[in-house]
UniProtKB/Swiss-Prot annotation:
Enzyme Commission code(s) on record: 2.1.1.45
Lineage top rank: taxon: Bacteria
Protein name: Thymidylate synthase
Subcellular location: Cytoplasm
Family: Belongs to the thymidylate synthase family. Bacterial-type ThyA subfamily.
Keywords: Cytoplasm, Methyltransferase, Nucleotide biosynthesis, Transferase
Gene this protein is translated from: thyA
NCBIfam families (UniProt xref): PRK01827.1-3, PRK01827.1-5, thym_sym
HAMAP family: Thymidy_synth_bact
Assembly and binders: Homodimer.
Pathway noted in the entry: Pyrimidine metabolism; dTTP biosynthesis
GO molecular function, one term: thymidylate synthase activity
Active site: 146
Amino acid sequence: MKQYLDFMRHVYEHGTDKADRTGTGTRSVFGYQMRFDLRAGFPVVTTKKLHLKSIIYELLWFLQGSTNVRWLQEHGVTIWDEWADENGELGPVYGSQWRSWPTPDGRHIDQITDLVAQIRANPDSRRLIVSAWNVADIPRMKLPPCHAFFQFYVADGRLSCQLYQRSADIFLGVPFNIASYALLTHMMAQQTGLEVGDFVWTGGDCHLYNNHFEQVQTQLAREPLALPQLKILRKPDSIFDYRYEDFELAGYQSHAAIKAPVAV
């Protein structure tokens, strides 16, 4: 994951110091892109240990269409707890928009089901898109989507994905987001009978929080290790039927975890 370390170093050394919504303060750049060949290994950061369980369960939770943290908590995942209300609700966040986007005439659009059907029927389409950025629903969301929009692309029998992330917490959030959408690309490829291609990560406001600088220096001093390979142990009937136990990262090794506070 040299690309990720280069990205972090670039923002740390050349970013602009800015205020932010949380009051923490950031150093940021506007606009950055990284490309990962998924055939060369699964793009998971190795210069610190990631909680892979949280990444996998969160993606499965999105695909369920859920917006309540209780299911995550039942599986030992607490990454959304800071934003949930007393009943565990987050408002119409990712899962709701992916699976049940409301229309003016009272219907709901399942973007994920439609996406799978489109990839199978018309792989050359330039409309293989899912958006979580629903302007009408944003006031009711506890946290508006950071990873807001993604598009798939098929060429030479390979499925690639590009994510646009409008707000990118480089130290804590981006490693999760890269791994999550790389995993989704593998799942989509399996479901549509394609091989994996590239995952392209594109960021808007790309920032390091001021209270992460010490951790950033620690991570930049570490040498990245070889990337693992993702193994999907079975092919479920649909994109919605995967389980946590279906995934294995063969050869995953990492440096020790680096703790850092979350800006809420």
